[in-house]
């Protein structure tokens, strides 16, 4: 859940104290917030928000009602829209389609930022991922859309490769597995920017 934690902490760091207070005091977050205030009191709103975020995630993993999803999300489907974390689902790779829709919304609303679809190597051979990439690469974004709305979607597909898709060996089951970067880069006529990065090399990740 490193991507979820990173996104949540980034959102907390960037938000104003007023906005964080509104989120923490929202009725739908009362169970999580009340538990944090009781067990881990703090006068610093950002410290409280970080504790609230971690507690909400762990509560869902351990099936507690104080979780963001009432304890039903488990370890696979945690989400918290106020911090920009959209839901996953039970279909491998289908979060790519959700991300493409969220990116289209951002584009139409002229909102700043980029949508990131965090996917595993098992998703590299799934239809929903290819459909999302095809949608994100449509030529009409440049040729048909009016000024101010033209250009590609603010969308990044982030694949984490651990060499397993569920319980399968992705290297021997996925088409051109070793050439995924070149394959994904060929979606757009001019080439969708694609790059392979060593996940253990922090400077390379930051540069990418």
Predicted regions: what is each one?
Residues 192-196:
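Structural signal for short hydrophobic segments within the conserved structured cores
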Residues 1-153, 166-169, 173-191:
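Cofactor-binding active-site loop characterized by glycine-rich and histidine/acidic residues
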Residues 202-208:
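Structural signature of the thiamine diphosphate
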Residues 123, 199-202:
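Short, surface-exposed acidic/glycine-rich loop or hinge patches that mediate macromolecular interfaces
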Residues 90, 197-198:
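Glycine- and other small-residue-rich loops at beta-strand/loop junctions that grip anionic moieties
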Residues 161-164, 201:
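Glycine-rich beta-alpha junction loops
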């Amino acid at each position: 859940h490193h991507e979820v934690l990173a996104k949540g902490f980034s959102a907390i760091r960037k938000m104003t104290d007023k906005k964080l207070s509104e989120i923490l005091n929202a009725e739908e977050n009362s169970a999580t917030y009340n538990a944090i205030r009781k067990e881990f009191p703090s006068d610093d709103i950002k410290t409280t928000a970080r504790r609230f975020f971690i507690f909400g995630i762990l509560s869902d993993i351990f099936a507690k009602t104080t979780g963001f999803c009432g304890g039903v999300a488990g370890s696979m489907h945690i989400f918290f829209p106020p911090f920009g974390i959209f839901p996953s689902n039970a279909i491998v790779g289908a979060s790519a389609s959700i991300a493409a829709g969220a990116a289209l919304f951002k584009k139409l609303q002229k909102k700043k930022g980029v949508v990131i679809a965090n996917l595993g190597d098992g998703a590299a051979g799934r239809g929903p991922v290819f459909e999302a990439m095809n949608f994100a690469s449509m030529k009409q974004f440049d040729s048909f859309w009016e000024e101010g709305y033209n250009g590609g979607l603010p969308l990044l597909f982030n694949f984490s490769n651990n060499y397993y898709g569920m319980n399968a060996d992705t290297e021997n089951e996925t088409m051109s597995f070793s050439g995924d970067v070149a394959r994904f880069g060929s979606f757009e006529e001019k080439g969708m920017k694609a790059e392979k990065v060593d996940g253990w090399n922090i400077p390379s990740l930051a540069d990418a």
